[in-house]
From Swiss-Prot:
Gene3D superfamilies reported for this sequence: Aspartate Aminotransferase, domain 1, Type I PLP-dependent aspartate aminotransferase-like (Major domain)
A GO molecular function held by the record: glutamate-1-semialdehyde 2,1-aminomutase activity
Main location as per UniProt: cytoplasm
Record-level GO cellular component terms: cytoplasm
Encoding gene (name): hemL
Disulfide cysteine pairs (residue numbers): none
Name listed for the protein in its UniProt record: Glutamate-1-semialdehyde 2,1-aminomutase
EC numbers: 5.4.3.8
InterPro entries, alphabetized: 4pyrrol_synth_GluAld_NH2Trfase, Aminotrans_3, Aminotrans_3_PPA_site, PyrdxlP-dep_Trfase, PyrdxlP-dep_Trfase_major, PyrdxlP-dep_Trfase_small
PANTHER family found in the cross-reference section: GLUTAMATE-1-SEMIALDEHYDE 2,1-AMINOMUTASE (PTHR43713), GLUTAMATE-1-SEMIALDEHYDE 2,1-AMINOMUTASE 1, CHLOROPLASTIC-RELATED (PTHR43713:SF3)
Protein family membership: Belongs to the class-III pyridoxal-phosphate-dependent aminotransferase family. HemL subfamily.
Domain of life where this protein originates: Bacteria
PROSITE patterns: AA_TRANSFER_CLASS_3
Assembly, per entry: Homodimer.
């Protein structure tokens, strides 16, 4: 019995399902979750001291790699002055200024402590600003676990086989309209049905919670135009894509300007940070300057701000984004070539520093229905073969993978050697 087995048994006695976030329980792949004791660079070590090349990266934040010296130094230095004050600090201004510089559509930004807080608050703000109730989201996209967003939710809810979460009142859900990702016609129909009632569209610019599904040509631009036409607020959820698809986010990569942007993951450098921001005229509707309420005891926590500032300062150095994309492409194309070699139906989507693996004979995966048609049983076998070989992938067929700047060409080669064996087992 491994140490992870023992720990999981203990955890299940005091933590629901033995984990503090459902996907970690390995329900999507079977078996016992791997308990991690330490991490450095591109690697994690389990409690039996086995090393893995890590493509989860704490689900996205670790874009520089684990335990990066610049972030660690900033956290230690800041912690020496105190852990939390519940008052304004200079460093939260520093981070806000840098975020607004890197993502120009964000004229003002409010810091929170999670991506869920960011999306929840942005939607409340959009509703208050427009004085409308209904929102549009997309099937298979996930924006955190706020009640109004767990309607045909993706990611963990897909893995659990519960596309509609119990506990969400029907009166909440009725205000959420769910359209088809990459299908502008479905969005047009929603606006035509409720032309005066829709407060906002919220969308992942790259759907990263039904694995990795990029937008098709003009999809995001089409959403922008529909929001302009009907007076709705256009919210781009960059919790996953922010600073990872491009330094200016996916909105920069795809050349589209939202009214509001939600951030998380990378902005905290591994600490719990979220943010939402956008046009000044909308952001001034938030308290204390406006009537829409939002608050948080740990919002702008100085240690989290220090980690985020150090992360983004390092990330903006010349060549980093190009290197991240280069590594991701090498991995993606290498995996596809190996799948073809072993005659395993397989497609890879990738953009910037994120990628998605699909066991399917479809040449393209562009929406929720395409994802749901993939062979999850093959993914389970592949996942465990890779785990045995020391490669840690997301333990779900519905989650994206993440590259970091700490990964090397040698790490990619090691991963592809493992994948050769894994695909051979599936042939």
């Amino acid at each position: 019995m491994t140490d992870s087995n023992t720990l999981f048994s203990r955890a299940q006695q005091v933590i629901p399902g033995g984990v503090n976030s459902p996907v970690r329980a390995f329900k999507g792949v079977g078996g016992t979750p791997v308990f991690i004791q330490k991490a450095k660079g591109a690697y994690i070590w389990d409690t039996d001291d086995k090393q893995y090349v890590d493509y989860v990266g704490s689900w996205g934040p670790m874009i520089l790699g684990h335990n990066h010296p610049a972030i660690l130094s900033a956290v230690i230095k800041t912690a020496e002055n105190g852990l939390s004050f519940g008052a304004p600090t200079p460093i939260e201004i520093d981070l806000a200024e840098l975020v607004c510089k890197l993502i120009p559509s964000m004229e003002m930004v409010r810091m929170v402590s999670s991506g869920t807080e960011a999306t929840m608050s942005a939607i409340r703000l959009a509703r208050g600003y427009t004085n409308r109730d209904k929102i549009i989201k997309f099937e298979g996209c996930y924006h955190g676990h706020a009640d109004s967003l767990l309607v045909k939710a993706g990611s963990g809810a897909l893995t659990l086989g519960q596309p509609n979460s119990p506990g969400v009142p029907a009166d909440f859900a009725k205000h959420t309209l769910t359209c088809t990702y990459n299908d502008l016609e479905s969005v047009k129909q929603a606006f035509e049905q409720y032309p005066q009632d829709i407060a906002c569209i919220i969308v992942e610019p790259v759907a990263g919670n039904m694995n990795c599904v990029p937008p098709q040509n003009n999809f995001l631009q089409g959403l922008r135009e529909l929001c302009n036409q009907y007076g709705a607020v256009f919210i781009i959820d960059e919790v996953m894509t922010g600073f990872r698809v491009a330094l200016g986010g996916a909105q920069s990569y795809y050349n589209v300007e939202p009214d509001l942007t939600c951030l998380g993951k990378v902005i905290g450098g591994g600490m719990p940070v979220g943010a939402f921001g956008g046009k000044k005229e909308i952001m001034q509707f938030i308290a204390p300057t406006g009537p829409v309420y939002q608050a948080g005891t740990l919002s702008g926590n100085p240690i989290a701000m220090a980690a985020g500032l150090a992360c983004l300062t390092e990330l903006q150095k010349a060549g980093n984004q190009e290197r991240l994309a280069q590594l991701t492409e090498k991995l993606a194309l290498g995996l596809k070539a190996l799948a073809d070699k072993h005659h395993v139906p397989f497609t890879v989507n990738y953009v910037g520093g994120m990628f998605g693996l699909f066991f399917t004979d479809k040449a393209q995966v562009t929406c929720y229905q395409d994802v749901m048609a993939c062979d999850t049983e093959k993914f389970k076998v592949f996942f465990h073969k890779m785990l045995d070989e020391g490669v840690y992938l997301a333990p779900s067929a519905f989650e994206a993978g993440f590259m970091s700047l700490a990964h090397t060409d040698a790490d990619i080669d090691r991963t592809l050697t493992a994948a050769d064996k894994a695909f051979a087992a599936l042939a």
